[in-house]
């Protein structure tokens, strides 16, 4: 069936393309990676290096690497039924093809967040609608996954930030003891932070831990 002969499919494809950036940010590992990289850059004290486009590009590449098995599993299960006049997002296609993606969301979401959104649905949604929502619905899993990823990103960011904060405080105290109060501690501490980060294999450790943090 060609696209001009199936306007519903064309509308569906255009709609998915329009929300694709939102799906990538909120429904994949991209959010956690981007937040951690931004915190790491701020902790090092280099506000504009690497630029945002480089950080987001690295986060996107790593997201493709992390999501690769899930995407391949979805592709293998994607066997849409061609029904005349029916859109391609049928419930049968959804239940079969998106099972690996649901498993990814469940494994990387905190159970308390999922339960929070389930209880929120019970308290706020109309009775006739909430009865149709399954416990593993994407309407529950995606928000729970997003909040869980933000929480984990802030935890990792805190662990990254503390050592560099200690270096800043140490340099600041040394400068005060030497009477060099007019010298910016950030200017002196930046080379030391970069040196320690490189000697410790900071990029390898950070990327390895981030990738391994996903089930």
From Swiss-Prot:
Q: Where in the cell is it found?
A: Cell membrane
- Which signals induce this protein? Repressed by methyl-3,4-dephostatin.
Example GO biological process: bacterial-type flagellum-dependent swarming motility
What keywords tag this UniProt record?
Answer: Cell membrane, Membrane, Transmembrane, Transmembrane helix, Virulence
Q: Which GO terms describe its cellular component?
A: plasma membrane
| Pfam families recorded | FliP (PF00813)
Q: Which domain of life is it from?
A: Bacteria
Q: Does the keyword Ribosomal protein apply?
A: no
InterPro entries linked to this entry: T3SS_IM_P (IPR005838), T3SS_YscR-like (IPR005773)
Which sequence ranges form a coiled-coil region, renumbered to this chain?
none
**Membrane topology reported for the UniProt record:** Multi-pass membrane protein
Similarity field: Belongs to the FliP/MopC/SpaP family.
Q: Which NCBIfam families match?
A: PRK12797.1, yscR
Protein name per Swiss-Prot or TrEMBL = Virulence protein YscR
Gene transcribed to yield this protein: yscR
């Amino acid at each position: 069936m060609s696209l001009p002969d199936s306007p519903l499919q064309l509308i569906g494809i255009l709609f998915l393309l329009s929300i694709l950036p939102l799906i990538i940010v909120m429904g994949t590992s991209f959010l956690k990676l981007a937040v951690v990289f931004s915190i790491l850059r701020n902790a090092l004290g280099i506000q504009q290096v690497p630029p945002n486009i480089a950080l987001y590009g690295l986060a996107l590449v790593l997201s493709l690497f992390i999501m690769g098995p899930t995407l391949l599993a979805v592709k293998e299960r994607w066997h849409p039924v061609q029904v005349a006049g029916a859109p391609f997002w049928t419930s049968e296609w959804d239940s079969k093809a998106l099972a690996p993606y649901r498993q990814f969301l469940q494994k990387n979401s905190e159970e308390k967040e999922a339960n929070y959104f389930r209880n929120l649905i019970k308290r706020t949604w109309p009775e006739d609608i909430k009865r149709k929502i399954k416990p593993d619905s994407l309407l529950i899993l995606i928000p729970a996954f997003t909040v869980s990823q933000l929480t984990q990103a802030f935890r990792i960011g805190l662990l990254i930030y503390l050592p560099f904060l200690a270096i800043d405080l140490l340099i600041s105290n040394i400068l005060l003891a030497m009477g060099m109060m007019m010298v910016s501690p950030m200017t002196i501490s930046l080379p030391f932070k970069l040196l320690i980060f490189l000697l410790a294999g900071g990029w390898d450790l950070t990327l390895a831990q981030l990738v391994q943090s996903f089930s």
